[in-house]
Each structure stands twice: as C-alpha cells, then as structure tokens.
Amino acid sequence: MTGVKNLEILASLNKKIGLEEIAASIRRVGLDPLMKKPVGKYSLGMRQRLGIAQAIMENPSLLILDEPLNGLDKHGVREMRQLIKGLKEQGKTILLASHNQGDIDELCDTVCEMDAGVMTMIREESI
C-alpha cells in the first residue's frame, strides 16, 4: 500500500476530509514526491512523517505525539520541529511524549516528568 492510499483509507473514515486535506498534510510533512512508493519501502523517518501527516490531516485542536521526531535525520528533525511550533502558534494543544531533552527544551511550555508511570514533577518552561 502506498502512503497516499494509507491516508485515503484513514480519510474515508471522516467524510470531512477530502483530497485537498490529504495533499496539504503530505506537503506539510515533506513527503510529496515519495507518496507513490509502498509504505514498506519507507525509511523510519519517512514513516514518522507519514504518522505526523495522519495526525494533522483532520486539523485537530489537540495532537498527541509520541516520540514524533524519533528516527528522523537532522534535517527532518529541524523541519518537524518547525511544523510542531507552527501548529502551536495556530493555537493547537500538543501533548508530546519524548525522552529527547532537546525536543522538550525547544517544543514544550509545560513539562511533566514521570518515573515508573507516576508523575514526579510538573514545571513551566520559558520558551
């Protein structure tokens, strides 16, 4: 299955999502020329981008992202950080789970630290 087909199937579950929204999410994550390839031939970074495209396609007010930058090269990390910052500037609420302190420092306003499934600290970041 291609990346485009993957997004089309997901979009078919929500009648409000059309080809325009699919194309926009593909462009926003930088997969435009690669979407005709089978997903099985995608690198880990390309799969991460596809996952982010799936998440933003519906234009949700809340995004839950679990290690969204894992597996991306330096260029991809930079691009996806910019995308996430842009989504925050649009007023989206983003719940981001990450072990990467750089991602946390650059992207998070409020940080909740957990240990063994228990919240141990909440702090406000000055971004």
Write out the residue ranges for each language-model feature.
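Conserved catalytic motifs of ABC-family nucleotide-binding domains
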Residues: 59
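Conserved ABC ATPase "signature" region
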Residues: 8, 17-34
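Hydrophobic anchor residue at the start of the ABC signature
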Residues: 52
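Helix N-cap at the start of a conserved alpha-helix in ABC-type nucleotide-binding domains
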Residues: 74-75
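Q-loop/switch helix immediately C-terminal to the Walker
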Residues: 1-13
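Catalytic Walker B motif of ABC-type/P-loop ATPase nucleotide-binding domains
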Residues: 63-66
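H-loop/switch region of ABC-family ATPase nucleotide-binding domains
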Residues: 98-99
